[in-house]
């Protein structure tokens, strides 16, 4: 074999690249100038290769004319730091009881460590990311979330206060709009401020959904640790509408940790977002695969 010999893999690669770019072109045209809200979480936040591929995806979106907005979680990172400092926390109905001291740690981790790491990742790939919390510019006004528990039907429900855990009361999109329609990529930590002046930790999926609604986003993309919504047989359900989702909830197909994500997606599309996607964040370049290929990846939820 001489130095000028080209193997089969080398012959295929340029053709494959051309085919992929050709398939992507209609989507680039379609979504140019549109806002895409991406919730970054799960394994994608702790695996170095996945973090790098995510950052490249976000930068490429901006380069081809999309307006990406990133909202991130950070529960595992919060748990690790609390454990390191010897701070014990309890969970009620899957939510962390958050006193003032714990909230200080939450703000430190979400608004500092995690947020700035994501900003740095995007900037290292040529983007211009700006880190924010919901407190910046009064972006997210929160109200305290109270849970209820009822032991017997005839008894009034017990109201449970879990501290500095909130839900979204109002979104002011002006800061995000200013950044997103310029050269910048907003990266948002899900911390809001209440009328009482206190900070509240809010579920990142819910924040992403509400921001997508207010920005009238084209798409909401939720990165998860599953391929998407699965049938009882474990098969991926690639497309759903609200009626189908309701039926799957009723028969128990959609349950557990997928429930809040699917409800977030439904609320977003009901609020005007064109489409919501629940995609596998464990797959490299999952965002690009969903945006730029005919097959897509994960589960698509639309109004119709």
UniProtKB/Swiss-Prot annotation:
Catalyzes the ATP-dependent phosphorylation of N-acetyl-L-glutamate. InterPro entries: AceGlu_kinase-like_sf, AcgluKinase_fam, ArgB, Asp/Glu/Uridylate_kinase, Glu/AcGlu_kinase, NAGK-C. The keyword Ion transport does not apply. It is found in: Cytoplasm. Keywords: Amino-acid biosynthesis, Arginine biosynthesis, ATP-binding, Cytoplasm, Kinase, Nucleotide-binding, Transferase. Coiled coil: none annotated. It catalyses: N-acetyl-L-glutamate + ATP = N-acetyl-L-glutamyl 5-phosphate + ADP. GO terms for molecular function: acetylglutamate kinase activity; ATP binding. Belongs to the acetylglutamate kinase family. ArgB subfamily. Pathway: Amino-acid biosynthesis; L-arginine biosynthesis; N(2)-acetyl-L-ornithine from L-glutamate: step 2/4. Its EC number is 2.7.2.8. The keyword Acetylation does not apply. Its main location: cytoplasm. It comes from the Bacteria. This is Acetylglutamate kinase. GO terms for cellular component: cytoplasm. It is an enzyme of class 2 (transferase). NCBIfam families: argB. One of its GO terms (biological process) is arginine biosynthetic process via ornithine. Substrate binds at residues 74-75, 96, 201. It holds the Pfam family AA_kinase. The record marks 39, 261 as: Transition state stabilizer.
């Amino acid at each position: 074999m001489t130095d000028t010999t080209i193997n089969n893999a080398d012959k295929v690669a340029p053709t494959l690249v051309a085919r992929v770019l050709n398939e992507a072109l209609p989507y680039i045209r379609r979504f140019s100038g549109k806002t895409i809200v991406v919730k970054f979480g799960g394994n994608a936040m702790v695996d170095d290769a996945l973090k790098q591929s995510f950052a490249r995806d976000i930068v490429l979106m901006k380069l081809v004319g999309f307006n990406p907005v990133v909202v991130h979680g950070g529960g595992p990172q919060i748990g690790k730091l609390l454990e390191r400092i010897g701070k014990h926390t309890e969970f009620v109905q899957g939510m962390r009881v958050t006193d003032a001291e714990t909230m200080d740690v939450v703000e430190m981790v979400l608004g500092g460590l995690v947020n700035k790491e994501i900003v740095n990742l995007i900037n290292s790939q040529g983007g211009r990311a700006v880190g924010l919390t919901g407190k910046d510019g009064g972006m997210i006004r929160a109200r305290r979330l109270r849970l209820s528990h009822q032991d017997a039907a005839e008894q009034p429900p017990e109201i449970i206060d879990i501290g500095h855990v909130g839900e979204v009361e109002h979104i002011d999109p002006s800061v995000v709009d200013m950044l997103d329609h310029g050269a910048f990529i907003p990266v948002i930590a899900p911390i809001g401020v209440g009328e009482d002046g206190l900070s509240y930790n809010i579920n990142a999926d819910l924040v992403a959904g509400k921001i997508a609604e207010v920005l009238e986003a084209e798409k909401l993309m939720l990165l998860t640790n599953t391929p998407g919504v699965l049938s009882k047989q474990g098969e991926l359900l690639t497309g759903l509408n609200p009626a189908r989702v309701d039926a799957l909830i009723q028969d128990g197909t959609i349950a557990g940790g997928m429930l809040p994500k699917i409800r977030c997606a439904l609320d977003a599309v009901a609020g005007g977002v064109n489409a919501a996607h629940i995609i596998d964040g464990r797959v490299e370049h999952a965002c690009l695969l969903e945006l730029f290929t005919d097959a897509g990846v994960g589960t698509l939820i639309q109004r119709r």
